[in-house]
């Protein structure tokens, strides 16, 4: 399923795997509003399809601020991820430090999230505890 609602700054492609929902996010813009919007949409889709695990792969070349990452990661439980196990892959390796910061903040708020360098690594992690 591809989400192409007019006016949105991103698209999401969802694909069901045996133990998790895969969500590929494409955008050329970034920031708190975009992050919160697509993460809420992904959490809603997990609930709708009865998935307790998700692999989110970002294909977003733009960079956001540390403040936006902190705010979004802090709000992950309210966005719907309190009971969803998250694997996160960013296609842009230069954003690794920012993603690791977000992971630390989210884990400190009780979210089960882990950053990976590839979809294969994330798939292995999600599959081993399913």
Predicted features and spans:
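Amphipathic, Lys/Arg-enriched alpha-helical "gate/interface" segment within cytosolic domains
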Residues: 2-130
């Amino acid at each position: 399923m591809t989400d192409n609602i007019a006016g949105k700054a991103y698209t999401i492609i969802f694909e069901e795997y045996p133990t998790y929902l895969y969500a590929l996010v494409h955008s050329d813009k970034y920031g708190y509003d975009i992050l919160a919007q697509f993460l809420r949409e992904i959490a809603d889709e997990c609930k709708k399809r009865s998935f307790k695990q998700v692999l989110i792969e970002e294909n977003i070349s733009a960079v956001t601020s540390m403040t936006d990452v902190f705010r979004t990661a802090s709000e992950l439980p309210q966005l719907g991820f309190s009971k969803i196990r998250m694997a996160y892959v960013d296609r842009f390796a230069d954003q690794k430090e920012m993603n690791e910061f977000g992971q630390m903040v989210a884990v400190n708020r009780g979210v089960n999230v882990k950053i990976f360098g590839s979809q294969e690594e994330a798939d292995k992690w999600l599959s081993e505890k399913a």
